[in-house]
Each structure stands twice: as structure tokens, then as C-alpha cells.
């Protein structure tokens, strides 16, 4: 007994330390609200990161069999805003009473009370990369597929405080039985191992609901300024405008993003996500440079083409050399269908056609307005592509031929042997730590 005491104490310390690391969305409406470290054969608490997992493990965090109580919904006031609770530990939230460890710091607005910022994967406020919420207009969780989700709100300074505001666009009403939503986060590549976070929850649009259906979502594309990787200027023409899917990255299967370890995708302007309500979601997702033609027929066909790539049932896993070397064009986040090898597992319940994600087409005027807004947003900090640039000016920075090519190649890593050696050392340290 005495001989085993040090090992037991070490385990307790390790569990206590890990209990406050990482972050999750917390609410009674969530799947896995009462999941503990002992529920699964592995630690699958809501705040545990998702990395190199099978589809069933990472999708809804593997918590579909742990639904919220009947009638528990997270309310989304159409055209308003909502406060979300983001924390490393359920015990530090208003829901501490149902936490295995009880109150562990509730009252602080820190996402991880008493812990350094490294516990929620950032070196400081200038290193946070944003998080988002997405919605699927399906009441049965077994009907929800990855391409049903549309990102409707982002917070660019997330994760930084426990109380995190999300602005809500004029969303239409949910079907009978409510909608499904999810919180997504990908942290800075230099502040933790490559991983994603996803927590699903039941949601309901309330108040003065809209009547405009959401557009068909497309995969986000890297288009913002990225000076850390040698791209000081944004390329707005490469943005996906309109409805966008969440970003599924670095899993064994089900990925729609294929950026490598040091090129993590983020829910911010780097991928065309504005801070706040995503008010362009009422048009089909399409590459900005294609939408600038002003022809609604071109927009519709382009959106259908892009969405077909995004919603294909086959996705490759991690990047491989077969995907080709980085091109001179700004990298796309869509993929060549011929290279797709790993399908989404199909649900045991067939999708309900009566609750399918509503879609819409928009006029060329709407497209031009949205394109101008995107141009202004991603160009705000650029001296080359100004906020007053016309759509034609923007398109000149990225050719249509480059943009419509569905083959995606990863962005080249920073040059220099010293830089690469430092990054490899950093990655090894992070993997050992997590």
C-alpha cells in the first residue's frame, strides 16, 4: 500500500492538472454534458481535444448517445446576440454543481481560473485565433451530416474569456423538434498540438425569426493576410463567400481541410470569417472571384460545383505527397475528387427530406454586395489591396483558372533550416505534453 502511494499521488496530480486544460462549450443543451473521464474507455470529456480520430470518435465528440434532457435548447435570438460559456472545466462554470469536482473557480471570467494561458492554447490575446458556432436545420441528430452545418457566428477573440459573445444573424425558424448546433475551435499552431474542438448541442431560433433560407455551404478557403508565412497581403478573390461549412481537420477520416501541421485553419479573416454574425450565409457558398462576374447563372453553377466538392462522401486523411507540391496560386481548401479515399460513415438513419437544409440562390446585386463586404473585411490591414478595391480589382489578384481548380495543395512551410528545426522541436515537445 505504502509503496504504491507515490504512483497514486502522481496519478491524482496528473488528473487534476489535465482537468483544467483545453476548453469546451458548456450548456445543458449540449451532448455529453455529464460525460466524465470514466464514461468512456479513454478520456472523452467535452474539453478533450480531437486529433487523429475516426469519424464516430470526433463527430459530435462521440457524444451522440449522451443527449441533453428533453426540452433543453440553447436559444438563438434572431438578429440579436447570445452569451456562451467556454471553459476548461465544468466546475468553473455556472454548472459546477454537476461537475465531479464541484466548484473549481466559478466566479472568474477566465476560461481556466488559476491556470496560465497555455492551458487554453494561447500565448496572449494577440495569439487567439477565433471560434465559431454552426447550425444544421435537422431535428434528429442521426440525420445531421458534416455538410449540413453552416457557420453562422464567429468570435475572433476566442478562447480568451469564459463569457463569450456570439452575434446571431436573422436566422429562419427551426423545424419542429429544433435544430442542431455545434461549437468549433482550432487554436494557434504555435500553442499546442494539431487538433480541433467540437461540442454539439440542441438549439432553437427565437424572437423575430427571419424568412430567408440559408444557402448551400461550401468549404472555406485561405484568403487573408498571413505575414507569418510570407504572405503579407490578402487575396479576397480566393475567399469563399456565402454559406461556409465548419473546418474538419487532422482526423483519420472525415476531413474537409488538409492543411499541414504548421498551417492550421482558423475561424478568422484568414479563412474569410468576419468577427460576429456571418450575414452572408443566405447565399450559396462560392469562390469570390467567380461571383464577381455578376451573372447569377454563373453563380448558381459555380456554387453547385463547389458544393459538390464540399459535400462529396469521400475525403482523404492527412496530407500526402500525392497531393502535389505547393503551387504558386494561393492554396485552395477544396480537394480533387479523384484523390478522395476515406468516406464519411453513413448514418443508420436516413436523412429526412422534410428537414433538409434550406437553400437559396441570390441575385447578382446581392453577390456584388457580399463580395464588396468580404473585400473590405479581409483587406482592412493591407496596404496593397485596400478596402475600397472594386470586385474587378480583387479578381485581378487571383485568376479564375486558379480559383476553380479543385485540387488543393498545402501552403509551403517557412524556408530556412533553422526555422524548420525549431518547429520540429516545438512539435515534439507539444506531442509529449499532450
Curated annotation (Swiss-Prot):
GO molecular function, one term: metal ion binding
Keyword Metal-binding part of the UniProt annotation: yes
Family per record: Belongs to the polysaccharide monooxygenase AA14 family.
Cofactor: binding comment: Binds 1 copper ion per subunit.
Protein name: AA14 family lytic polysaccharide monooxygenase A
Extent of Basic residues compositional bias: 420-434
Source organism per UniProt: Pycnoporus cinnabarinus (Cinnabar-red polypore)
Record keywords, A-Z: Copper, Disulfide bond, Glycoprotein, Metal-binding, Monooxygenase, Oxidoreductase, Secreted, Signal
Subcellular location: Secreted
InterPro entries: LPMO_AA14
Amino acid at each position: 500500500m505504502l509503496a504504491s502511494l507515490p504512483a497514486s499521488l502522481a496519478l491524482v496530480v496528473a488528473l487534476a492538472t489535465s482537468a483544467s486544460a483545453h476548453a469546451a462549450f458548456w450548456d445543458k443543451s449540449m451532448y455529453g454534458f455529464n460525460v466524465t473521464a470514466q464514461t468512456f474507455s479513454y478520456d472523452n470529456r467535452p474539453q478533450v481535444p480531437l486529433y487523429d480520430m475516426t469519424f464516430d470518435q470526433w463527430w459530435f465528440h462521440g457524444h451522440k448517445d449522451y443527449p441533453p434532457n428533453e426540452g433543453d435548447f440553447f436559444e438563438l435570438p434572431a438578429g440579436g446576440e447570445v452569451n456562451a460559456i467556454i471553459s476548461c472545466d465544468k466546475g468553473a462554470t455556472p454548472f459546477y454543481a454537476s461537475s465531479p469536482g464541484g466548484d473549481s473557480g466559478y466566479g472568474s471570467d477566465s476560461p481556466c481560473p488559476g491556470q496560465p494561458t497555455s492551458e487554453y492554447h494561447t500565448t496572449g490575446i494577440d495569439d487567439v485565433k477565433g471560434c465559431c458556432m454552426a447550425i444544421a436545420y435537422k431535428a434528429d441528430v442521426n440525420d445531421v451530416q458534416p455538410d449540413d452545418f453552416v457557420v453562422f457566428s464567429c468570435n475572433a477573440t476566442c478562447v480568451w474569456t469564459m463569457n463569450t459573445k456570439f452575434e446571431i444573424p436573422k436566422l429562419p425558424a427551426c423545424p419542429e423538434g429544433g435544430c442542431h448546433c455545434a461549437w468549433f475551435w482550432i487554436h494557434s499552431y504555435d500553442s499546442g498540438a494539431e487538433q480541433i474542438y467540437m461540442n454539439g448541442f440542441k438549439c432553437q431560433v427565437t424572437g423575430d425569426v427571419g424568412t430567408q433560407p440559408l444557402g448551400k455551404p461550401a468549404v472555406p478557403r485561405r484568403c487573408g493576410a498571413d505575414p507569418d508565412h510570407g504572405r503579407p497581403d490578402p487575396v479576397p478573390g480566393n475567399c469563399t463567400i456565402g454559406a461556409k461549412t465548419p473546418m474538419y481537420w487532422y482526423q483519420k477520416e472525415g476531413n474537409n481541410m488538409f492543411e499541414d501541421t504548421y498551417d492550421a485553419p482558423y475561424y478568422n479573416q484568414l479563412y474569410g470569417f468576419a468577427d460576429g454574425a456571418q450575414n452572408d450565409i443566405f447565399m450559396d457558398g462560392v469562390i469570390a472571384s467567380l461571383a464577381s462576374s455578376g451573372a447569377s447563372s454563373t453563380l448558381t453553377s459555380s456554387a453547385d460545383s463547389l458544393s459538390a466538392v464540399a459535400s462529396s462522401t469521400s475525403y482523404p486523411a492527412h496530407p500526402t505527397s500525392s497531393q502535389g507540391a505547393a503551387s504558386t496560386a494561393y492554396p485552395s481548401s477544396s480537394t480533387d475528387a479523384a484523390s478522395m479515399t476515406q468516406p464519411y460513415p453513413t448514418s443508420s438513419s436516413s436523412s429526412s427530406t422534410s428537414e433538409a437544409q434550406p437553400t437559396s440562390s441570390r441575385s447578382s446585386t446581392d453577390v456584388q454586395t457580399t463580395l464588396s463586404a468580404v473585400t473590405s473585411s479581409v483587406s482592412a490591414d493591407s496596404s496593397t489591396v485596400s478596402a475600397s478595391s472594386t470586385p474587378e480589382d480583387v479578381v485581378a489578384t487571383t485568376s479564375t483558372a486558379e480559383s476553380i481548380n479543385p485540387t488543393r495543395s498545402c501552403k509551403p512551410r517557412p524556408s530556412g533550416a533553422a526555422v524548420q528545426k525549431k518547429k520540429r522541436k516545438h512539435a515534439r515537445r507539444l506531442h509529449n505534453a499532450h
